[in-house]
Amino acid sequence: MGCAASSQQTTATGGQPAAGEKANPAPANNNPNAANKAETTGAAEELTKESEPFVEPDPNYPDLSKHNNYLAESLTPSIYNKICNLRTLSGYSVDGCMQTGVDNPGHPFIKTVGLVAGDEECYDLFADLFDPTIDKRHNGYPRNAKHTTDLNPDHLKGGDDFDPKYVLSCRVRTGRCIRGYGLPPHCTRAERRDVEKVCKDALATLDGPLKGTYYPLTGMTEEMQDKLIADHFLFDKPVSPLLMSARMARDWPDGRGIWHNADKNFLVWINEEDHTRVISMETSGNMKNVFKRFCNGLNKVENALKAKGYEFSWNEHLGYVLTCPSNLGTGVRAGVHIKIPLFSKHAGFESILKHYRLQKRGTGGVDTASTDGTFDISNLDRLGTSEVQQVQSVVDGVKKLIELEKALEKGSDISGQIPRDPAIVRAEQVKEGYPDLSKHNNHLAHCLTYDIWKSLKDKKTPSGFTLDGCIQTGVMNPGHPHIMTVGMVAGDEESYDVFADIFDPVIDARHGGYPKDAVHVTNINHADLKGGDNLDPKYVLSCRVRTGRSIIGYSLPPHCTVEERAAVETITIGALDKFDGDLQGKYYPLEGMSDETQTQLIDDHFLFDKPVSPLLTAARMHRDWPQGRGIWHNENKNFLVWVNEEDHIRVISMEKDGNMRAVFKRFCEGLQKFEQMIKKDGKEFMWNKHLGYVLTCPSNLGTGLRAGVHVKLPLLSKYPRFDQILRALRLQKRGTGGVDTASTDGTFDISNLDRLGSSEVQQVQFVVDGVELLVQMEKKLEKGEDIFDILPQQCRPKPPIKPFSYDYPDFSLHNNWMSKCMTEEIYNKLCNLKTKGGVTLNDCIQTGIDNPGHPYIMTVGLVAGDEECYEVFAPLFDPVISARHGGYALDAKHPTNLNAAELKGGDDLDPEFVLSCRVRTGRCIRGLALPPCCTRAERAEVEKITTEALSTLSGPLKGKYYPLTGMTDEEQEKLIEDHFLFDKPVSPLLLCANMARDWPQGRGIWHNDEKNFLVWVNEEDHTRVISMEKSGNMKRVFERFCDGLKKVEDSIKSKGYQFMWNEHLGYVLTCPSNLGTGLRAGVHVKVPLLSQQKIFDSILDHMRLQKRGTGGVDTASTDGTFDISNSDRIGFSEVHLVQQLVDGVKLLVNLEKALMKGEDINSLLPEKLREDSS
């Protein structure tokens, strides 16, 4: 799955830069020898892996330097660069997957995953990131591993005999998701409602003890809610930052609900973290009964779904596919509440848990501690073992815990029953010689156990080769985190038998599953190959087939003696000397080679060098160099034999054209002739029916064949699913420079992926057929055509199901301007539109959906993701703006006036009453998305543009920028003391608008030396500009405000940027409430007497002013001191609004003074209000 893409994706996400992104041209390949370097590198691919080279990170690459999660451990610039522009068929990106891990750095002692899937396809399309994350999270799970599923409760042994004195309850839960629907981080409302309906209908088919009732969270009565809380069945709206950042709380409680049977021991949560969470439980010690109910219920639900054409997301590698990688596999958590007050204090408690693969927590849930010796004990594993195996580990472990608790109650010594400390055991094993492979990443490290090592360490093959000889290269070379090497070699043919206990599992792992009883197929009859003589030479530059052969009776290169090596050389030369016709050639020994011959072989790219790779030198393949080594080639230079390199011989057939058939024919005929010649001398190749041709490295067993073509695929190689296409065709790619090189111009060396289990003809056929298809795809892409229909069938993901439910939000309980103005007609008209930057209507309205509002506080419920939103979604934004701003007409023009000289007064506000003055506004930079939808790169660009502009300020405005990232404690304390620091958003309004993403990246605070001119960068808007001082001089504050703003704007204009502004909306900002001027001019004013008058609010309304407490938004005054500011933003100029404030505050102060003197204030009131005061 995961190869297909829609026609839109072919052009929009096929490796091309998205709108607004700059493509970095790839450097040209100027190496004339690159095409032939592949084979002259010497050793097989598995033995020459090198470290990943430095890669320049994409501008959107996140800063994870302070993070402690598996995402941070797994993500590299090269991985991110490769997948950051890809989209699944439902439109999900890798940034969506990893946002929760970026936003939540984690705890030093608690490692989270940091990654979620938005749909099933994520695990395939973004496998370069998910695979290493899954491997780390599940303690080693390679990408070719197969998961085991077993939901047959009869396979569980015991579990019905827990002592109820100790086991208080048993519970088994898992998750299931329905294929074709988005997962909770990404699903639409319609998809969520579909899932609810599909699951509800399936659950309705259950009968007998499983028959139950569904309780939707939407519209749930208080009585029902209380009942479910009392039963501990109700799940709450997510508040965890991990879930919030993954966007799992959207549209709450729409589409969520709880189902349980009449006996209340089988429960299903719908649309919580996964589509369903299935739970079987009871207050007893009968885990067998609980597990049986669990399996029966699950199987019946699955059958009901299948009857309606649905299925659970499952594959043989990951098992059941769920939202969080931590739950892949079974998704099972089998837990018991167990009382072990004595043993839980024993030093051996943790050892028992580790031994049985168990984990503990308190009975209060995740991350709680036990307070009375009662624990929730559950299985540690999810992936790689079956449901039965995981529940069995709990059953066996809990039995042991009870046994030990009882022993302690009797005062018995239990020290002999406690597994020894693994670290001590490990140290003792290392002293014995057992290698420490705990930091290694190779197949040897994953397969070798102490028991295997101990059983083999003293064995030798008849020629004297030991286990240490086999594994030394893997011990000395830990490997690379993202490149899995084998870590083993054979010293002779018998190595594979004598040391089969380690070779067999390594071979199985390396070759993607190859059991001990498998039989390998050999076929080197070139006539059986179909086609291959017509690969288009415009695309296919060269063809090559190579293999290795070893001669029975002689040790392999890691172990052979000088005499054996010389004998191999003699046998080989003797056979090759008998070649005639087109195969006739000459042998060039490396020992004593003349400079002239060496130069010629270098020019022909035939010469192989002395091994320098630590993988080869640790395997002792460089010994006695260059004795016994040499190169033979025919006169046409298209058939080549290396002698005593990594294997006894390496045979290569090649030519510069697209005729793979001719290359393979020559390969087969040459090999067969060579074998005939040595057989006449009584020699044979190493071969057996299980392993095929026996060679030094287990990676080359079977055929040992690598059939490769150099093919030009500049367009297809940029296609989002190129790697998945290759995997489906059983092919692999590398650059034309050899192992671990990358293509720089779209030319690749494409070869067969398999070696063992299929024949030579089959493997070359894969290459021929696959390359033909790749070239066909390249040609279609050149014509601008879609390639979906010719993709390999097995790699086409199932397209998303088209929901039957309606996507329109439920606004029945909402009180915000968006919900008041939205209609189904407007929604249907706009819901499928996008701005050029990709912002959707749902991006804009999500905060209003998720925050219904307060009966007495009307919020907007709408944000813009970029400037274009106000045009594309105008049918919604226009009525919201009109309603929010008291009837702002569609054809209205907003006046702008930042000439402070036009302000009358303001420098004479009485400081006895006016404590401070402040003017703030926001500004956003055209061409860059607004905070709800900006990328990390855009946020960084805003920061750069703004700070560079601010650095040009001089005189009283000169200041310094303090980025939140990397801020010192000293700076932080100082900014808190000055009340300048802004915090990470915690308001649900901002969180649901996606404004806290990537915190604190790109955010910062700038202020001048006098600390009266302040700029916040990338808070709610690109910039928030503030002028302030502790006095009653609003005129001076406003002059500084206008002066600073103008100078910053002039500076950014000089760099080719400008603020978002138009004549209708004025300055364009994120929230419609701030459109126009974005200005809030406020004073802290003491009016304790006036504020107690009934007419106080009427005066403010009349003067177009508003009040709040001095603690900020939605705070109340406690001592008669208020923060008074202008009510309006749009339709009036900056000067007009500040003038309103100045005039209004003067009136308030005069009224307060009159009241202090005991005077009647009616005559001082505005005329319209005077009658009301009587």
From Swiss-Prot:
Compositional bias ranges of the Low complexity kind: 18-39
Subunit structure and binding partners: Monomer.
Record: residues binding ATP: 169-173, 232, 277, 333-337, 542-546, 605, 706, 734-739, 749
Catalytic reactions on record: creatine + ATP = N-phosphocreatine + ADP + H(+)
Origin superkingdom: Eukaryota
Residues of the Phosphagen kinase C-terminal domain: 166-408, 539-781, 913-1155
Record domain Phosphagen kinase N-terminal: where: 53-139, 426-512, 800-886
GO BP annotations, alphabetical order: cell projection organization; phosphocreatine biosynthetic process
InterPro entries: ATP-guanido_PTrfase (IPR000749), ATP-guanido_PTrfase_AS (IPR022415), ATP-guanido_PTrfase_cat (IPR022414), ATP-guanido_PTrfase_N (IPR022413), ATP-guanido_PTrfase_N_sf (IPR036802), Gln_synth/guanido_kin_cat_dom (IPR014746)
The protein's name in its UniProt record: Creatine kinase, flagellar
Main location (coarse class): cytoplasm
Recorded domain comment: Contains three complete but non-identical creatine kinase segments flanked by unique regions.
GO cellular component, as recorded: cytoplasm; cytoskeleton; extracellular space; motile cilium
Location of this chain's protein in the cell: Cytoplasm, Cytoskeleton, Flagellum axoneme
Enzyme class, UniProt record, top EC level: transferase
Biased composition, class Polar residues, residue ranges: 1-14
Function (record text): This axonemal protein participates in an energy shuttle that utilizes phosphocreatine to transfer the energy from ATP generated by the mitochondrion in the sperm head to dynein in the distal portions of the flagellum.
Protein family membership: Belongs to the ATP:guanido phosphotransferase family.
Region (Disordered): 1-62
Entry keyword set: ATP-binding, Cell projection, Cilium, Cilium biogenesis/degradation, Cytoplasm, Cytoskeleton, Flagellum, Kinase, Nucleotide-binding, Repeat, Transferase
Enzyme Commission numbers on file: 2.7.3.2
